[in-house]
Amino acid sequence: MAKGKDARVTIILECTSCLRNRVNKESRGISRYITQKNRHNTPSRLELRKFCPSCYKHTIHGELKK
């Protein structure tokens, strides 16, 4: 039997530079990725460098609040 909650949880990563640069009117939206993280290994918020199709470059994607 499993004790408590599962260690793996599904998270959503969102582009941080798209949120700051809302100046572009022709923006195709905000880039979001869905992934999983292990809560025991990384208890803090996750930040990864991923490709953003709206910015056309690699940017930092941060974990959204639940």
Curated annotation (Swiss-Prot):
Keyword line: Chloroplast, Plastid, Ribonucleoprotein, Ribosomal protein
Major localisation: plastid
Pfam families: Ribosomal_L33
GO cellular-component term (any): chloroplast
Domain of life, per lineage: Eukaryota
Compartments where found: Plastid, Chloroplast
GO biological process: translation
GO molecular function: structural constituent of ribosome
UniProt similarity note: Belongs to the bacterial ribosomal protein bL33 family.
Matches recorded under HAMAP family: Ribosomal_bL33
Name of the protein described by the UniProt record: Large ribosomal subunit protein bL33c
